[in-house]
Amino acid sequence: MTLSETTNGRLSDIIRYLMVYGVLLVSPPVIVAICVVVVDRLHGGTMDSDSVWQTPFMTASMLLGTVLAIVVFLWRRWAVLGLGRIRRADVLKVFLMAIVLFIGWYLPEELLQRLVEVPDNLSDKEFEQLTSGLAGLIDTAVVAPISEELLCRGAILGTLLKMMPRRPWVAIVISALIFGVIHLNPVQMVFGALYGLLLGWLAWRTGSLLPSIVVHVANNTTVMLMPASAEKVIVNMSLITEVLLAGVSLIVLFTALRWFNLRYKYI
């Protein structure tokens, strides 16, 4: 079972992963932004920062940065996209149970976010800019979740498990906290860390990043594609309805968790 093949189990490895990941993600958008501003100035334009970020080149450059991160992490074997402890015959079943796990997680998390008011520094306008166009949609819904799983559950969790093989839960908690912090938004820090616990446990239990990637992609895709009308339905639900739906969702969640726990009990 391995989530990463080249780590030596050192803190310096984790720092290197974070630095490389950050540089790869930031470099293409920064370079493109500079080029856009230079071209604009040469033509006598006066584009402000908002206008620069609204150009179609920016979402494409962010997608490029995320793809570069995936390529580098896989090329360097800092993270491994293998089956781990999952048998080939069980792949489809595992993926389906990962979807069930996400379904059980999604609504309780949404309701908890409403109960626990944590500041959200990402405005609707900024979210629209990040997810605009086909490139933004693909990046946010699919490519970014894959890159984050390679970083946090592959490289970082893989390193931490080598550093503390007898304390996997400590490794899972630390990787979850890092996952929350890198989002740089209070609400995503808090709930991202909780989400990271679930994804970290899933990766550790199965020895594979594939189930956590399925859950992560399902989550981001749902957030991206859920119509505003559906969100209003959730917001306007009565307390009794919320409690009942949350209860049913938790039953689904724990059923999926129990399935994974029994299926991959012995490590």
Locate the predicted segments by residue.
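Juxtamembrane helix-loop-helix connectors linking adjacent transmembrane helices
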Residues: 39-53, 79-147, 158, 162, ...
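Structural signal for the C-terminal ends of transmembrane alpha-helices
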Residues: 70-79, 202-205, 253-262
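Alpha-helical transmembrane segments
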Residues: 13-29, 93-104
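Membrane-interface helix/loop boundary segments of multi-pass membrane proteins
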Residues: 147-174, 201-208
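Alpha-helical transmembrane segments in multi-pass membrane proteins
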Residues: 22-75, 241-246
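Short, Lys/Arg-rich, polar N-terminal cytosolic tail immediately upstream
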Residues: 1-12
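C-terminal membrane module of polytopic membrane proteins
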Residues: 217-267
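Hydrophobic residues within alpha-helical transmembrane segments
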Residues: 23, 143, 174-178, 214, ...
